């Protein structure tokens, strides 16, 4: 029976209760000289050192102290004799809770590539890098809920299975119970989805926005935070097939209110992560600096991770229209010298990441909010401006990443919305429930979408989006 209560490594590392008996349970990170055990229990990125007195333990037991083994250690908390931490545990007793075969365990104490760790995503949590990344991810998720809760928003759970395409992109995963080998057919030979589970064609959701708009017309302020899915065959470092989205919708807000809310949210959650994950962010900053050393000088970032985060906290976001941005880009040196991969030569072009990053990193040197985009490159639900060619859209651009938030004031005028849906060949009968909000007490409202993994990517400094979600889903990738 345990007589000593287990302590977390994080608490012990901050303790000065020297001479007290403590118990630590965790996993062996390293064991050297048959004496020094580095133990981590997941409560912190840092290990605690446990010291076994020479010749005090059975050789057979010592041989089982391998990297990855789960252990329980009881001993005296003492002032550390070495550098790096102020305390260590002088071991009086230890036991092996779970063995780890040293020859088979893939995470030996050496540097592993991120590509290799992606292949063993079920074990990569045990590395310092991913311990840090997912602690930051947790902190950001908590901060998002706290931000909206403190402002009186209602957290809305929107459906994962839907019959609508909120973005009109058509890149959706179909949900069906029909027999693939012998699906029922209509008289015209098409698959008869009326005989399917839901009695119609259904898909995994691409966005909870439309449903959030319905709730905003009753609660005033709502937000969603859940998984979304895109069957986009993009095998890049910036795309996932399954990712998480934060989507607030606020009744009576206009585009300016929307920009203010998004800027406040981003600054709040970044500050929370910096305040609560200081050790993790410091580790990730140093990891990034080491990685940068292998790059040519002109490819290295001008800002380290902490400076980049402060760059967003300490600057008011620059606000300008798409039209103003196009003029800046057309007259920019990289555009004139054809250094851009995509040359800007006309109004109406869809901006690429290189253009967005130029505006943020080179021209304004602060985060940027672009507004009033051409209606032809934006979704049907965005409110049309009086000029007939632009809509009240907004994108927030960050250094190193480009677009991190996309949103708009929504079109609350029924006739305008119906006309735009017709122009874009979106069947009104399939979205009758959405149009009903414009028939019964319609009101101005606005909202935006924040891709959670893009946010985590930015705050951690990681460069591949598959490294900021526990088990990434992408083309030909659905392990674990």
PLM feature spans:
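A generic alpha-helix surface/boundary motif
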Residues: 142, 323, 414-415
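Class II aminoacyl-tRNA synthetase-like tRNA-binding/catalytic domains
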Residues: 2-251
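Generic detection of long, well-ordered alpha-helical segments
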Residues: 58, 65, 84, 131-138, ...
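Generic, well-ordered alpha-helical scaffold segments in large soluble proteins
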Residues: 27, 139-151, 207-210, 214, ...
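TRNA-recognition modules of translation machinery and tRNA-sensing kinases, especially anticodon-binding
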Residues: 199, 203, 217-227, 236, ...
């Amino acid at each position: 029976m345990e007589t000593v209560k287990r302590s977390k490594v994080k608490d012990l590392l901050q303790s000065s209760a020297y001479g007290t008996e403590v118990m630590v349970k965790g996993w062996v990170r390293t064991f050297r000289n048959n004496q020094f055990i580095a133990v981590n229990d997941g409560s912190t990125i840092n290990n605690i050192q446990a010291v076994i007195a020479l010749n005090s333990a059975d050789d057979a037991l010592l041989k089982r102290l391998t990297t990855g083994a789960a252990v329980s250690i009881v001993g005296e908390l003492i002032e550390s004799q070495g550098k790096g931490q102020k305390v260590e545990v002088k071991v009086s007793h230890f036991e092996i809770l779970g063995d780890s075969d040293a020859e088979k365990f893939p995470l030996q104490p050496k540097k592993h590539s991120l590509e290799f760790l992606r292949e063993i995503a079920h074990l990569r949590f045990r590395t310092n890098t991913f311990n840090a990344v997912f602690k930051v991810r947790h902190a950001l998720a908590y901060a998002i809920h706290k931000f909206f809760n403190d402002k009186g928003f209602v957290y809305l759970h929107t459906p994962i299975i839907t019959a609508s395409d909120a973005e009109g992109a058509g890149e959706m995963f179909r949900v069906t119970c029909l027999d693939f080998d012998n699906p029922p057919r209509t008289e015209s030979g098409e698959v008869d989805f009326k005989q399917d589970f839901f009695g119609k064609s259904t898909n995994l959701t691409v966005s909870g926005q439309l449903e959030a708009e319905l709730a905003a017309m009753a609660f005033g302020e709502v937000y969603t935070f859940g998984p979304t899915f895109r069957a986009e065959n993009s095998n890049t470092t910036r795309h996932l097939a399954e990712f998480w989205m934060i989507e607030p919708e606020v009744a009576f807000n206009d585009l300016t209110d929307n920009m203010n809310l998004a800027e406040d949210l981003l600054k709040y959650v970044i500050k929370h992560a910096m305040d609560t994950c200081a050790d993790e962010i410091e580790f990730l900053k140093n990891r990034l600096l080491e990685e940068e050393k292998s790059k040519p000088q002109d490819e290295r970032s001008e800002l380290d991770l902490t400076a980049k985060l402060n760059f967003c906290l300490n600057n008011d976001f620059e606000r300008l229209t798409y039209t103003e941005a196009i003029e800046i880009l057309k007259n920019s040196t990289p555009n004139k010298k054809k250094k851009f991969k995509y040359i800007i030569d006309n109004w109406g072009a869809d901006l690429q990441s290189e253009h967005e990053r130029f505006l943020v990193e080179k021209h304004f040197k602060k985060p940027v909010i672009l507004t009033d985009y051409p209606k032809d490159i934006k979704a049907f639900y965005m409110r049309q401006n009086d000029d007939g060619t632009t809509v009240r859209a907004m994108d927030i651009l960050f250094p190193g990443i480009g677009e991190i938030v996309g949103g708009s004031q929504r079109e609350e005028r029924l006739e305008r919305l119906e006309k735009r849906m017709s122009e874009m060949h979106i069947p009104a009968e399939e979205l009758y429930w959405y149009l009903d909000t414009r028939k019964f007490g319609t009101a101005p409202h606005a909202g935006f979408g924040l891709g959670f993994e893009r946010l985590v990517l930015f705050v951690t400094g990681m460069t591949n989006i598959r490294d900021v979600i526990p088990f990434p889903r992408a083309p030909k990738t659905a392990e674990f």
